Structure formats: C-alpha cells, structure tokens
C-alpha cells in the first residue's frame, strides 16, 4: 500500500512514545505526518520545539490554511480541531469538543481518510478515552492502514484497547516497534 498521509493520535502517556519514535524515523519519509495530542487549552507551544529537537524531520505547529508538504511533521495546536482538506491544506476549527477533546483524533482521522482514501495510515497511541476509535474505523472503510500501540506497553491502555475491541487492526505494535513499522511504509 502506498501511503500519502500518516496521522498519529494519542492522549495520556503518548508523548513519551513519540519521544522514542521520532528520533528513529527515516529522514527520507515522503509523506506528511500529522500528530494529534490531547493538550490543555492554555498549554504553551513549546511542544513543537521539544518534538523538533528529537526528530530528523522538521516539526511545525499547524496553522489555518497551511499547505501540507511531504516529509514534514505537523503538530495540532491546542484547542483546535484539525481538518485535512482535499486541496492539501489544513483547516483549524473551534466547533464543539468530540469525545471531550479539542483537538479530536476522530475528527482528523476522518478528514484525512476523506482526503487520502486508499493512501492513509492511522496510528493510535496511549490514552484515557475512546477518541480515535471511530476515526480508525473510517480509515479502515477507506482502505487505509490501521496501527495501534500494544495496550500492554501503553501508560494508559484504554484508548488502544478500545480500538482493538472495535476494529480489525492491521498491526498492534510495542512502542519500540512503531518507528521501524513507519519506516517500512516509505
């Protein structure tokens, strides 16, 4: 399967996983990577700098109407839903929270699957609610690739376990296996 977009979603406990995954990504990844993390509304934007310090790829916090470029990691800003448009740009949205979250992983997974049918991969990491499960179902319906962190390696197993319970996932990976799996998608 050719991947043109990878979206990673997570909540409680997922930042540590990303800090392990990012340094091990290939520098020649040809698709954009979008990261949706549940963050407090007033959280500082230092997270992009922190992730950038660990990544071989550039990391940018998403801005409204920003073009989506290959080989770049994009981070959702706090308190905005991130929509991926069919014209290869982002839209930021402040509509109601979904699964008590803004940004919502489901919102981004679903819009990414619409924009990149047959060429989307979704990765769901550690977290404390069911956000991401419906979006992964939709990715699967659009013939995308569905990857979930092994709940036993998650700080908070609820989110990945919900996905496993509801969806036929393509891969269940220990956190140490995620980067090499992504690298094989290149």
Where are these regions (language model features)?
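Conserved acid/base catalytic micro-environments in cytosolic active-site loops
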Residues: 1-186
């Amino acid at each position: 399967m050719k991947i043109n977009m990878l979206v990673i979603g997570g909540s409680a406990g997922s930042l540590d996983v990303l800090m392990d995954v990012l340094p091990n990504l290939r520098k020649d990844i040809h698709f954009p990577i979008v990261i949706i993390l549940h963050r407090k509304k007033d959280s500082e934007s230092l997270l992009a700098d922190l992730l950038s310090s660990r990544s071989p790829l550039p990391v940018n916090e998403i801005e409204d109407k920003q073009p989506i470029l290959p080989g770049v990691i994009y981070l959702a800003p706090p308190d905005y839903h991130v929509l991926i448009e069919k014209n290869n740009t982002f839209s930021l949205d402040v509509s109601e929270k979904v699964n008590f979250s803004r940004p919502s992983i489901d919102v981004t997974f679903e819009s990414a699957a619409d924009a990149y049918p047959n060429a989307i991969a979704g990765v769901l990491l550690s977290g404390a609610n069911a956000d991401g499960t419906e979006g992964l179902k939709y990715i699967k319906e659009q013939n995308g690739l569905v990857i979930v962190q092994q709940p036993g390696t998650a700080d908070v197993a609820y989110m990945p376990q919900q996905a496993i319970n509801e969806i036929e996932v393509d891969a269940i990976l220990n956190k140490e296996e995620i980067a090499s799996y992504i690298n094989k998608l290149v």
